[in-house]
């Protein structure tokens, strides 16, 4: 099977859905892995890291879609990708189908096999833990006086009291926030 990793093009998206270690694992299982140039840069992975893992670097998304049986990335498809889909191709990404009727219509019309990555985590969602920790950090950022906050630190300092925080929920996100807070 030919597996393709796309570079996410959505503004503000820096994650990658496949690390070089995961690419190496797929290669060891007999897959040919293609990585769009720059696909891992936002997550601090260079093209050379993927090449070292046994992947081939593709020049653009068109090459990935034309070459690969299985195509993956983090965020939902962009309109510029719709015409690149091929019948029978497997798409694995965070589709959020309830949010985009147009995207669902394109997926159905193109006859791809689409999986929503947001619903298929093996051990719950590691992204939820990350979201909880980042949420706490964002809250701490808003406490800074330069950002209009009270100037308190979550942990307190120099005899000043710590800020009071409220974490709603005790799932993976809430637990992640709690781990960072204490």
Predicted regions and their residues:
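Gly/Ala-rich phosphate-binding loop of Rossmann-like dinucleotide-binding domains
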Residues: 27, 178, 182
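An N-terminal-biased, well-structured beta-alpha scaffold segment characteristic
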Residues: 2-106, 110
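Residue-level recognition of conserved structural "scaffold" positions that shape functional pockets
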Residues: 11, 176-178
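Glycine/serine-rich phosphate-binding loop and adjoining beta1-alpha1 elements at the start
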Residues: 2, 8, 79-164
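Hydrophobic/small residue at the entry helix of a nucleotide-binding pocket
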Residues: 173
């Amino acid at each position: 099977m030919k597996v393709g990793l796309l570079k996410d093009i959505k503004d503000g998206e820096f994650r990658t859905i496949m690390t070089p270690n995961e690419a190496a694992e797929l290669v060891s299982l007999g897959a040919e892995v293609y990585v769009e140039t720059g696909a891992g840069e936002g997550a601090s992975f260079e093209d050379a890291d993927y090449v070292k893992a046994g992947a081939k670097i593709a020049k653009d998304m068109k090459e990935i879609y034309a070459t690969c049986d299985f195509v993956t990335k983090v965020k939902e498809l962009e309109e510029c990708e719709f015409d690149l889909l091929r019948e029978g191709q497997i798409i694995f990404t965070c589709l959020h189908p309830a949010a985009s009727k147009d995207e669902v219509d394109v997926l159905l019309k193109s006859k791809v096999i689409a999986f929503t990555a947001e619903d298929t985590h093996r051990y719950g969602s590691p992204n939820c833990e990350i979201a909880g920790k980042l949420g706490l950090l964002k809250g701490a950022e808003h406490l800074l006086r330069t950002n209009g906050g009270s100037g308190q630190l979550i942990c307190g300092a120099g005899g000043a009291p710590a800020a009071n925080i409220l974490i709603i929920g005790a799932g993976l996100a809430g637990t992640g926030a709690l781990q960072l807070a204490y």
